[in-house]
Amino acid sequence: MSSFQQGVSGLNAASKNLEVIGNNVANSNTVGFKQSRAEFGDMYAAALNRAGTSNVGIGVSVQAVTQQFNQGNITATSNPLDLAINGNGFFEVKSGAQTVYTRNGQFQTDKDGFISNNQGMKLIGYPIDANGLIQPGAAAPLQLPTGGVAPKVTGSNTIEMNFDARQAITLPAGSPQVDFANAKSYNDATSVTVYDAKGQDVALTYYFQKTSTDNWNVYATANGTSVNVDGAGKPLPVTTMTFQANGGKPTVPLAPVLINIPSTVNAAGATTLAIPGVALDVTRSTQFGSSFGVTSMAQDGYAAGQLAGVSIEKSGVVMATYSNGQSKPAGQVELATFRDPQGLSPQGANLWARTVASGDPVVGVPGSGNLGVLQSGALEESNTDLTGELVNMITAQRIYQANAQTIKTQDQVLQTLVNLR
């Protein structure tokens, strides 16, 4: 009679296996989904004082349905807030007092600027303090800045260039003055945009006039107005440069030179504020027998800017990019791992909750310890092996049919016994 029990248990097990496989197939296109596997064990009736070799099993039972947390394929998207974890870890998301975990990195910003998933749950990470520094350990929902960035007045201007040692001395006869309208009164020129305290742009132009074999005068204008003049209003150099005889770096000046930029009217017709004490650094320049050229030009000021975009680095640092070209950290994504991920409780919607079996989460930044790294503008696909699952489905179907045949055969045997006379 145990054949009936064996067959029924086989039908139940095969049915459960088909349910698991069907769920895997149904979620083969679900972002961050982890496929499950039904695990079975045989069953025996309890029999005391009986040799083990004479026991006959009474069927099969489902021991567990376990999730397989192997890595899914990563595909690129056009949303910079889409995140894929390459390696171990879960995103931590929160709604009210409920904290759950997910591998689904489909994020966007809500009306308040919080990074959240499509259920409105906020992504947890490390925010920035008042000084713009990331606060490790102070986990909280990540929020993008909603305002702009204030302007910064230019405080330094570093220029690295080469002066052509072959050029002729251009100092006009009888006068050391330069005429900005006369290109023959200077050898070379270069320009840079600097900013006043209001973020208004100022066109700062430098003119270089060779006065002897290794000496150059450096003049400057702001929006066409000389920044240094004598009592008669005629231009004066802001500094002079003296080079070594071998053409190496200058011996004068050896340190940045402070220049004061007066209030002027810029190209937009706006009256700009004076910019005092701009440190002009030309100490890395050279004078060789090659054409004049600017190798690098840098200044540290900028105009006001509005939030223009966001990017997330592989370490989880969220960078806010502004319309003035500036970028600032807005926080850092936190990841969590568990001693036993199999112990996590599936909550649906690609979410898991911690349990006693899983242990408490161990949190950290991406790339630290055994945590994976993030890929921005990408998503982790379902790890369902669709081809393999379709094969498993056919196998489970055949097993179901075979167990049904076991019951049918046993019924025929019993019918034969009943018909005996």
Task: Give short role names for the model-derived ranges.
Residues 7, 11-14, 29-40, 326, ...:
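Alpha-helical heptad-repeat coiled-coil segments that mediate oligomerization/polymerization in large
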Residues 403:
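Acidic/polar, glycine-anchored loop/turn motif associated with catalytic or activation segments
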Residues 34-385, 390-392, 399:
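Small/polar low-complexity and glycine-rich loop motifs
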